[in-house]
A protein has these predicted regions:
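Histidine-rich, glycine-flanked metal-binding segment
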Residues: 1-52, 424
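C-terminal cap of metal-dependent C-N hydrolases
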Residues: 9, 313, 367-433
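Divalent metal-coordination and catalytic microenvironments
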Residues: 9, 22, 27, 47, ...
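Metal-associated gating/positioning segment near the N- to mid-region
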Residues: 46-113
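Divalent metal-binding segments
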Residues: 60-69, 88-100, 120-131, 147-158, ...
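A glycine-rich helix N-cap at a beta->alpha junction
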Residues: 108-124
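Histidine/acidic residue-rich metal-binding segments in metalloenzymes
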Residues: 130-298
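His/Asp/Glu-enriched, well-ordered alpha-helical/loop segment
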Residues: 197-223, 292-298, 303-376
Length: 435
């Protein structure tokens, strides 16, 4: 007997929507097509779209060190509530995930506590080059995280010689927070206390493009893969579109949905993140990049902080906002608005993450692959509210906003983990495997 059949839905297969049923057995996709066998469970997906399980390649779940704000358990609940079946989680915790002992500790903390599948970045420091050379076969390791500019945590690697050493020794993709620390320090004098509108003045477009040019130069010199996170400027879009190959890059849903000065007028320090939300000329260029398939991934940069901290006077307010639960509704709404196609979105949250990072058996609806699915209703409009946010932070920059298109089911290894907003079953996610 089969474990699960998903019937009557339109399945995203080989870049097209196909009217086929999908059978699941032992956590794998058993058969695609007409299913005559019986199953323990049947989902009637009539009127819905069955997608491969969607992957968020940039999240910060704050454990260890800041578990009042988020932890691996609560962050994973937010993920499955938003139709995300797998996450990559960041190393800027306290202590940071920058040695083998702390990496193993994080794997131990995740076991039987995370609902979704997971992998962790290994944090680069100025003096852990030997570790970076031996990560190729480390279980649950998706890549190396390099902070070239200071942000939350203390994993800064700002000097060119040290950045060079990271790439020289890298045995995995290096994902980069790309801001120029020297420019950040010079620009500090431009900060106006109490005025978050000066956040993108301090963390300027020049600060971003200067760093990104340097990262690309160093990565290419060593013939290593660099994945530039949360690109925010028109200059970077134009530059990176000419430097593909070993270089890939991400844009966040936030930077494709809200922009300055409106976001700071409306949200104040709740709109503060690094790199910042910028003006409409940058926003428009980011969309130009998406339409032309320049960017490779969409990652949420889920980086929650408690309200009491976000409401501190700028610049004492921390940078970051939640996003893993809202990534799919926000982007599906953009699909419905014609800003990008469903095919493009599937490249960004399923297929490209698999190709860039070498994730095994994910990202496609294929026989023999893992039975991870995100079922969505493209016609259902939801209002996102703070009280429905699963993150411990309890807020979202999209509070009160309506989005058309939303996940209705999150299925992992053939088990329904979220159905119509309700979280089901046990937290039994497993580490992702990489080739």
């Amino acid at each position: 007997m089969l474990d699960l059949i998903i019937k009557n839905g339109q399945c995203y297969i080989d870049g097209e929507l196909k009217d086929v049923d999908v059978a699941v057995k032992d956590g794998k996709i058993h058969k695609i097509g007409e299913i005559s066998e019986e199953a323990k469970e049947i989902i009637n997906a009539e009127g819905k779209t069955v997608l491969p399980g969607c992957i968020d390649t940039q999240t910060h779940f704050r454990e260890p060190g800041s578990t009042d704000t988020e932890d691996l358990h609560s962050g994973s609940r937010a993920a499955i509530a938003g139709g995300i079946t797998s996450v990559f989680e960041m190393p800027n915790t306290n202590p940071p995930t920058s040695n083998m002992k702390e990496f193993q500790r994080k794997l131990d903390l995740a076991k039987n506590r995370m609902y979704c599948n997971y992998a962790f970045y290994f944090g680069a420091t100025a003096d852990n080059a030997n570790d970076l050379a031996s990560l190729k076969d480390l279980e649950g390791c998706c890549g190396i995280k390099l902070f070239a500019g200071s942000s939350t945590g203390n994993l800064l690697v700002a000097e060119e010689d040290d950045i060079d050493k990271v790439f020289q020794n890298a045995s995995k993709v290096v994902a980069v927070h790309s801001e120029d620390e020297a420019i950040l320090n010079v620009n500090k004098k431009l900060i106006k206390e109490g005025d978050v509108h000066t956040h993108p003045v301090w963390r300027s477009a020049e600060c971003a493009i200067s760093s990104t040019r340097r990262i690309v130069r160093i990565a290419n010199r060593h013939k290593k893969k660099a994945h530039i996170l949360h690109i925010t400027t028109k200059e970077e879009i134009d530059f990176l579109s000419q430097h593909k190959g070993n270089i890939t890059f991400e844009i966040t849903p936030q930077h494709l949905t809200i922009y300055a000065p409106d976001c700071y007028d409306k949200l104040g320090t709740y709109a503060q993140m690094n790199p910042p939300l910028r003006d409409k000329s940058h926003y428009d260029r980011l969309w130009y990049g998406v339409r032309n398939n320049f960017n490779d991934t969409i990652g949420s940069d889920h980086a929650p902080h408690l309200k009491e901290n976000k409401e501190k006077t700028y610049p004492n307010s921390p940078s970051g906002m939640p996003g893993v639960q809202t990534l799919m509704p926000v982007m599906l709404n953009h699909v419905n608005d014609g800003r990008l196609t469903l095919h493009q979105l599937m490249n960004l949250v399923c297929e490209n993450p698999v190709k860039i990072f070498g994730i095994q058996n994910k990202g496609f609806i294929k026989e023999g692959f893992d039975a991870d699915f995100t079922i969505v209703d493209m016609n259902k409009t939801i209002e996102i509210k703070n009280e429905n946010i699963e993150s411990k932070c309890g807020w979202t920059p999209f509070n009160g906003d309506k989005f058309k298109g939303t996940p209705t089911h999150t299925i992992i290894a053939g088990n329904i983990k979220m159905q119509e907003g309700k979280i089901l079953g046990d937290p039994d996610g497993t580490p992702l495997k990489f080739s």
